[in-house]
Amino acid sequence: MKYYPLLLALLVSGASLNALSTPLSTQQAQAPGYYRMALGDWQITAVSDGTVAVPFDKLLTPITPEKLKARMAQANLPVNAETSINAFVINTGKQLILVDAGAGPLFGDAGGHLPENLRAAGIDPQAIDTVLLTHIHADHSGGVQREGKPVFPNATVRVDQRDVDFWLNPAHQRDVEEGQRHTFAESERSLRPVIDAGKLSPFYAPVQIMPGIDAIPAAGHTPGSVIYRVSHAGKTLLLWGDIIHAHPVQLPQPEVAIHFDVNRQQAVATRENVLAQAAREGDWIAAAHIAFPGLGKVMKAEEGYRWVPINYSAQGK
């Protein structure tokens, strides 16, 4: 039996070598997409609906291909960068307000993950009291329905009347580029179940939605685009919608528009005003298309502005 220790060592080493030669499986799924921050005693939860690759080289204008590539490279991104689709929940202690609803079924597997991530964050979609849409576009309003039924059955859906009048009227197809005309059918598909359920309640901005939450006009990207200003406990959070699509480009160069803008000149003017105010006031920003969680601040830079993301807090402060 004096050879037993040697034999055991050889067996163990052989097993170890076999284990090393077996390929390790990899997992593609990320952790549940939610992140919390505090606004006084109100809680803000950023919730991911997914990410989608956007061909900015075909969509941003005016900018040269060389300049676009250089701007994106400064952020270590390709010109067809994978872009976040972010939504946000405001918990006032009495109400749950969802700002934007993601893409629902309209972006395939790239979007539509909002309900599962809400549940992962401990938020039941049926407990949402109000859905505030920054505007009507697939990746913001598409998630209000699934299979012809409201995803948030107990919520009133609120959006500026000017977007309702525009996107639910096919006659306005002549007012947009051909590549945008699919938005009219998507808008009808998304909002019709909400309308039929008597849950759509439009407004005209500027207006107070409820104490502490105001809708501020931000037209240009769409006729009824708004920013939601949340003010509580001496702090302010601005929920931007589509003020920014490609922050490595549009922060240093706010004059760069995107082909999705219904009125590019107005969209640029809105962005310039919003960025200047955000940098001046130092308010918190919740951005739909800046890398998840899309929370941070805007600061002046040598050229235009720069994005400063929120510092990660395990306590959600």
Predicted regions and their residues:
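Metallo-beta-lactamase
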Residues: 19-115, 119-123, 127-141, 234-241, ...
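Bacterial N-terminal signal peptides that target proteins for export
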Residues: 1-7
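Short, conserved loop/helix-junction motifs that constitute active-site signature segments
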Residues: 148-154
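Cap/insert and terminal regions of metallo-dependent hydrolase folds
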Residues: 108, 227-229, 233-317
